[in-house]
Amino acid sequence: MRIRSLCLLTPCLTLLAAPDVPAATAADSGEPIVVSASRSYRTVSEMAQTTWVIDNADIAQQAEGGKELKDILAQLIPGMSVSGQGRTNYGMNMRGRSMIVMVDGVRLNSSRSDSRQLDSIDPFNINHIEVISGATALYGGGSSGGLINIVTKKGQEEKQVEVQIGGKSGFRNGSDHDENVAAAVSGGNDQAYGRLSVAYQRYGGWYDGKGREILIDNTQTGLQYSDRLDVMGSGTLAIDDHQSLELMAQYYNSESDGKHGIDLGKDFAAVLGKGTAHNSDKLDSDRIPGTKRHMVNLQYSNSDLLGQDLVAQAYYRDETQTFYPFPALGGKKPDYVVSSISASEQKTDFYGGKVTFNSKPLDNLILTYGADAEHEKFSANQKFFNLQKAKESNGLTLDSAYNTGRYPGYTTTTMAAFLQSSYDINPLVTLSGGVRYQYTKNKVDDFTGYQQQQLIAEGKATSADAVPGGETDYNNLLFNAGVLLNLTGTQQTWFNFSQGFEIPDIAKFYGTGTYGSPVNGHYPLLSSVNINDTRVKGIRVNSFELGWRYTGDSLQTQLAAYYSLSDSSYDINKKDMTIFLKDDKRRIYGVEGAADYAIADTDWRVGTNFNLIKSETKAGDQWENGA
């Protein structure tokens, strides 16, 4: 039996050791780390692409210092940008472009770019994290910047008990403390074994260096005064020497405590620039911000199916994301008034399956091929609160008045087939290449204009034309190719080309329109952005990379220069949060690297990482600095 406990009180966030370069060998056994995110189960040293593996010890070290998962990744992965201290990873990217996040190979990204993929699991339940930097054609849409695969802890044959207790405080106030407690039990026999875990985290108030309480984020929603519960179970059945069946199920709920909110001042003074907002423990709202998710993943493995390795997965995920109540302004400057206060809720149902074969038809040739199929359904609503009660309570008493649609509902169906190859010309040179064909079908529902829905709900109109829905599809062929040179047993250098593809957020692109003056209470639609007349253009990215890595006994380094070019870009309209496409080409290039050194005869390591990046947009014949 193994019991591990932790009690940590820190007046400030402290790094106990420098971040490391994930090694190509496991720290405890010396065995190669297999990167399952490659789909071909290659070791790091066999991959012609920048690859990082963050092991459990590094994750635990960072988490024990009080860091969230997204902060851990930003700390340890050179090409990943830093996000705010909130619930979402909004604004985070890899090498300046979008990334895919998966748990045990199940993607958490949706067609709706909701940015809560890293609000998905407690670090206590993570075994290791695999990261592939740059466009990954093998996984298709959305992976133009890179891929993160979170591999969960699994049970062992022997009985094990793991317990973790922790807390941190800045000693600024009685509410300035976070606590966490987690426990897991695993065991079984050589034919069947499993693991069951429960992890709970409570967040208190947050304070700055001068002892002032940090205001709760009412845009992407903050973690102050919230609770997180992650319940996860997994089981493995060894059918015979070659076959196994593995089931993983998770319930995840990260939600505000329902009592703390923002005091907006008398008559919304803080919103109108006539006062200052502050946190309050008197919130009474019919909608609480948070993330709730259920996920099930069933995997079948066969290491000898007609001489091939087979991995087949079937999975399901549903999630509900709610946001903090947000006031909207009406009137004209300088006589603005708060016209409404509301909060959105977005629901996603997602299921799919994938089959991957690995075969070795020749001694020097490895083929990886298979197919993916996924279906996603999305809906969103906006809850409006009683404005008079909210006004009288400084925005703290929020009783439901009515609901409207927030974005048009849609479904997305994706089917893909892929082939990847790796050929050893000789012990020095390995060539790799692959292709993925992906078919995507989007179906969008009819949607009445957002403002017109409000007017109808408030009795100021009787009806309005709907922006018509419809459907469209995309066919994409994505390629990748690379060459790996094994300079020595501990050094490799590589050149890689890979393509990525992404379809901008269709919920924000479609469903908007221009309406005429009402006629007998009915708003006529004059023009609109709809799927039939305006087919959103996908963005294709070509990515190039030149890299080098060294994996020694004490020193481990990895360095890469990268360049990516997209044929178009998109931006966000800050007024209504819709998106619009621009035909301007965008290029991003830079250099990233990391080094880690283990000091002999000690448990200490020192290291550093860096990322120098530049983004440019082409306007006419000139390249200009981008965002």
Question: Where does each model-flagged region fall?
Answer:
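Short acidic/polar hinge/loop motifs at secondary-structure boundaries
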Residues: V106-S133, A183, G233
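A beta-strand signature from Gram-negative outer-membrane beta-barrel systems
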Residues: I121-Q164
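Membrane-embedded beta-barrel scaffold of Gram-negative outer-membrane proteins
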Residues: Q299-S303, G307-P327, N486, Q492-S498, ...
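Face-selective signature of the C-terminal outer-membrane beta-barrel domain
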Residues: A238, H242-Y252, R287-Q453, L484-N486, ...
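Extracytoplasmic beta-strand/coil segments of soluble accessory domains associated
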Residues: S36, K70-R107, N127
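Transmembrane beta-barrel wall of Gram-negative outer-membrane proteins
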Residues: G174-Y203, R212-H260, K292-S303, P361, ...
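N-terminal periplasmic "start-of-domain" segments of outer-membrane beta-barrel proteins
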Residues: E31-E64
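Gram-negative outer-membrane beta-barrel transporters
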Residues: Q164, D424-L431, T440, T551-Y570, ...
